[in-house]
């Protein structure tokens, strides 16, 4: 039996990101997801919303049907 997995090329936060340090955040998502590591990608609050920044995923964890990413915000386009 295969494992369902989703490949993502942008980070959609839906306002659920948690600040760990000045520009380091974690985000927990349902299901197993793959993100490019250490590659700049857009950060958005919603899938079709405006770009709020650019980030690079530094750590990717899978556990109990969830994905946890740790990413570094490299630029901010909006404070709202």
Curated annotation (Swiss-Prot):
Pfam families: DUF2584 (PF10763). Gene3D superfamilies: Hypothetical PUA domain-like, domain 1 (2.40.240.20). The gene is ytmB. This is Uncharacterized protein YtmB. It comes from Bacillus subtilis (strain 168). It comes from the Bacteria.
